[in-house]
């Protein structure tokens, strides 16, 4: 018993000792073989993972806390939260109030595990290294939000200025600036910036183009994060450039725009210091260099109609060299500049139609020539421009103009009938223009052999004692053969019967006035260049300023006191070309400036400037016509006349100087318009109408042919539109066509400009017959008589108006041959006789003079009777009564489908009793006589098949029987008196 007690007490003491010993043991951090704890954290992270994880030896636990301390007693932005106190698992995190920054990239800390029940029991310290990783959470920053730099114009600057930027991030790539960028560089600004922020120019800057530039620049770190934009202003400092600046070297000129400024934005600078040259006066000379044809002044327009009228040139002048006639000839090459090239082996014989007989000693010869010097052998030979020599058996030169030794020489031999004197016969002019291989214009004025002058390019040649050389000779000897031959570009040798002494060069505009001499004033006027300079600032000139032109206005001299004044005057210099169609190409203009200094009147020349005027090809106007391409009609409308293009529109447009399309309809005229049927019309049944009164008021001729209509004559587009829109189409057998296709086309400028071809399709529908609602039609043999109400009142109508309103014309009641005869006369008719509502129908043929006289007499007589009848009807009130129909012995049978009545508008109305009586016997005799004069009895002898069928028009009448009684006329009278048939 005692033994058991001691065993129990010993066990209790052992357990108590074991517990005390365990509680007193310090925790041990398990590094799992590592020497220290390591962690990496991003600046923007809160939870940190360590290697290895936090843990303790399980037998040394439990732990409730970890203690973090720094070696330098710095604040620790971390704490550790225990997850499992027995294993020591914990989480390292950044304190809520703490912020990590890469500027402190590493933390060296000591970690100790603290016993749960006793804070004094701690583990040994373990090293914890935490490295902070940069996250590029800062954008780069440029030091200044605004930079200003200055650059001198005219040169490339490698360093305009330097921009500096920084980044609060650490190291590469987040903390380093790798690039600078100009963000508005899409505007092609002349600037660039490198990776170090150095701004430079890529091309010389121009103060005139832009006085300053504003750039937006950003800095970019190596991680491609951009900074905010910084504004950079670059001011361009103007550099004094001596001479003309801001000059547009190319000026485009469109024909017909009038004058155009050559130097609208120009300025003139003088950069010398006043100590060197103080300006006293400044002078600028503008020269327009316009040569022949390709370079500007077209000398071949010397003898055009406009020049002949304006300068008073003789209309008897003959053109000896016709370039247009030689276009298809293979003998000479037609050049692009409208000259003819002679290759030294060919010539052109002048026909007798252009010139006959010998050239007298009074004449004017004008021509344009381009001739090169050539070799010495070529210079020693005669090169004939124009030569008149014997046609057969002899080689005598009666007259010749030729080149030899680069001299222009003329031979004019007196004929055998002249006095036997030793007189002047040959002239030799020495002038540089002959062999400079440029186009020049020459005019030889022979007012007898003792009065000879030469005009070159519109300027008189200044003769002296030695130039020209004049050689004398005797007259030619008398011969039987007097026939001569005139040749251009060579000379005919009659003895050898071949051409010789050929010209080598180019000729153009060869004109001869035989037997008369043009005045020098007229020749100079004709050679005035149509291209000139103009000065538009005459009203702005000051007292010290002047503007002086050369005689031909191709040179202008401006004078002023300062360079700025000259610059303002240069802005007013303009170019003008008065030709309607100038030769396209470029013209050169030069500007020379000279400054006169106050110091000893020294003169200084400024740099010259050169520009070009590009004359564009004259744009032809565009002529367009439009209308509805589909036109619906019916047989009735075609029978009475269908307008063919009622909504026609004619428009003329042309590009203006700005290239914009402009309506110029009012400033042009139409030459002709044609309207053709496809296929061609049937001459027997198809006709056209023309508004005769309108055509008579316009300068238009109206013609018909098998294809259709032709309107011609220079007239406005509005005039043609009105006529064409009132042209009507007729068909006496409308059922023959279901549709008709026709085209309309117009032309202008002598036929050079054609309009579009307008296609119109006319669809002809059939006439719809209205059916009665009753099943039984009234008996055709006994219709109710037609009543005419002639009583006065609101509903009463004039008899003529009643006829026009209630009746329609029926062309089929007339034979086609008779109808064509009527239509061909195209004569005006009384209103009651018109069936086409004012349209004159015709084939275009005109009756003979005798027929016309008879027709005029008939129409006049009928008009008188018509007026008398109308006056009687209007003066006499008409009681209502039914017109009783009297049938002939054969009987009249009426057709219910339509009653044909031939109405004679000349019938008189009986005044007494209101009854419609016949005319008196006297009136009938007069009417019969009148009708016999204008009848077509002669034409009725040959009756066509269509005319033989006229009995179908009035089936109730016998063709050879006159109705007695109620009917006041018969079908025979209706045909012979031009009375219209109306269908009810």
UniProtKB/Swiss-Prot annotation:
Q: Subunit info?
A: Interacts with isoform c of daf-2 (daf-2c); promoting daf-2c localization to synaptic regions. Interacts with klc-2. Interacts with unc-104.
Q: Does the keyword Glycoprotein apply?
A: yes
List this protein's GO terms for biological process: associative learning; homophilic cell adhesion via plasma membrane adhesion molecules; olfactory learning; positive regulation of synapse assembly; positive regulation of synaptic transmission; positive regulation of synaptic vesicle transport; regulation of synaptic transmission, glutamatergic; synaptic transmission, GABAergic
Membrane topology (UniProt): Single-pass type I membrane protein
Name the predominant localization. Golgi
Null mutant phenotype reads: Defects in associative learning, such as temperature learning, olfactory adaptation and integration of two sensory signals. Mutants display hyperactive sensory neurons, resulting in accelerated locomotion and motor circuit activity. Worms show a reduced number of GABA vesicles at the synapse resulting in less GABA release from the presynaptic GABAergic motor neurons.
Query: Which InterPro entries does the UniProt entry name for this protein?
Result: Cadherin-like_dom, Cadherin-like_sf, CLSTN_C, ConA-like_dom_sf
Stretches of Acidic residues bias are at: 918-951
Identify the residue ranges that face the Cytoplasmic compartment according to the record. Answer: 872-984
| Signal sequence interval, chain numbering | 1-18
Annotated Basic and acidic residues bias: 886-896
Give the function comment from the record.
Answer: Cell adhesion molecule involved in associative learning and memory. Acts as a regulator of GABAergic synaptic transmission at neuromuscular junctions by regulating GABA synaptic vesicle precursor transport: possibly functions as a cargo adapter for unc-104-mediated transport of synaptic vesicle precursors. Promotes localization of isoform c of daf-2 (daf-2c) to synaptic regions by acting as a signaling adapter between klc-2 and daf-2c.
Q: Which GO terms describe its molecular function?
A: calcium ion binding
The known PTMs are summarized as:
A proportion of the protein is proteolytically cleaved before the transmembrane domain in neurons, leading to release in the extracellular space.
Q: Specify the protein name.
A: Calsyntenin-1
Glycosylated residues, per the record, are 206, 305
> Where in this chain does the record put each Cadherin domain?
66-142, 143-257
Keywords in alphabetical order? Calcium, Cell adhesion, Cell projection, Glycoprotein, Golgi apparatus, Membrane, Repeat, Secreted, Signal, Synapse, Transmembrane, Transmembrane helix
Q: In which tissues is it expressed?
A: Widely expressed in the nervous system. Highly expressed in many head neurons, including most amphid sensory neurons. Also expressed in other tissues, such as intestine and gonadal sheath cells.
